[in-house]
Regions:
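N-terminal, polar/charged subdomain of small-to-medium soluble alpha/beta proteins
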Residues: 1-73, 79-119
């Protein structure tokens, strides 16, 4: 996404897969989704954000499949004329992806044991 002419702000959030350290057996996460359901939910979240803040453009990217520890997993970018709108929208969408988006992750362990939970 490029910063559209006339906008003053591009707020971004880049999230990596956290290395939990103490549990050295976890080597990656496998992230799953149902494409239609997830895309619909993300479009709805962007629509909600657009009614709250005046933004010009939004880019959401969330990786699917195997993602190794410390690799980027999510990118949220928001272009707006004012930084408050850009930062607030970026925070709202980041929180949505973490807490409400229909994504599931499974721990990938070196010992082949895995646990499935909401992303």
């Amino acid at each position: 996404m490029t910063l559209l002419r006339g906008n003053g702000t591009l707020a971004t959030f880049l999230g990596d897969v956290r290395d939990y350290g103490a549990d050295a057996d976890v080597v990656a996460f496998e992230i799953e989704h149902y494409a239609d359901v997830t895309e619909r939910a993300l479009r709805h979240a962007v629509a909600v954000a657009s009614t709250r803040w005046d933004v010009e453009a939004v880019l959401l990217i969330h990786r699917i499949g195997i993602v190794l520890l410390s690799e980027p997993v999510v990118l949220v970018a928001v272009a707006a004329k004012h930084r408050e709108a850009a930062f607030s929208t970026c925070e709202f969408l980041t929180d949505y992806l973490k807490s409400r988006a229909p994504l599931w992750k499974r721990e990938v362990r070196g010992d082949a044991i895995s646990t499935l939970f909401d992303a």
